[in-house]
Amino acid sequence: MDYPLNNQPATDRYDRMQYKYCGKSGLQLPLISLGLWHNFGSVDNFSVATDMIKYAFDHGITHFDLANNYGPVPGSAETNFGRILKENFQGYRDEMIISSKAGHDMWAGPYGGNSSRKNLMASIDQSLRRTGLEYFDIFYSHRYDGVTPVEETIQTLIDIVKQGKALYIGISKYPPLQARIAYEMMAKAGVPCLISQYRYSMFDRAVEAESLPLAAEH
């Protein structure tokens, strides 16, 4: 760790990272973001998790990506991140892009793991409480569940922005047909889709066929 002795982020942190505009928005994101899917749950070492967040921010990584079911235990990554934020980054919230998602299994019963309005509204309120935040910079529908009408899910995301619980919205792992419906519905409502999150690497380039060109159109 090359954190200063006064435990404050390095003053040259923004010189250590490049940033690009996200889609057609005015929001810049770092070329590298930190996902909290692993290493930040209640079964992990909290001190190590804290050091990772500090090191990332110290090197210009401003985007921290959560989901309500990240852990393990589900929800614990958001809780731990909220604690890290409170204990180490007072005064730096406006320099961070914090995102979360909902749509995978989170609690028992028929309302705890789909993309319905019921689930998404409950989920974002729970996530805000766990993190101690007043809003998320980005909130995603974590998946198309194959049952909930896309229109219901997307209208809920639009309403979440209008309620001030998120600044931007996005989708994750949506098939092309449902993604097109989402993009067009968001644009018509004046709340365009900021970002689409897919599995994409040198070893998995399937999204190049349809999903990436479709996203580029919008």
Language-model features: where?
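Beta/alpha (TIM)-barrel catalytic core signal, keyed to glycine-rich beta->alpha loops juxtaposed to Asp/Glu
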Residues: D2-R16, Y144-H218
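Structural preference for beta-strand elements that scaffold enzyme active sites
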Residues: Y21, L29-S33, T62-H63, E95-S99, ...
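N-terminal binding-site loop/beta-alpha segment at the start of enzyme catalytic domains
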Residues: M1-M96, K162
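Active-site beta-loop-alpha junctions enriched in small/polar residues
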Residues: W37-N39, A67-N69, K101-D105, S141-Y144, ...
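Structural motif corresponding to the early beta-alpha repeats
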Residues: G91-S115
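Active-site mouth loops of central-metabolism enzymes
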Residues: G35-S47, M106-M121, H142-T148
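Short, acidic/polar
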Residues: V43-F57, N114-T131, E152-Q155, A179-Y183
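Active-site groove signature of glycoside hydrolases
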Residues: L128-P149
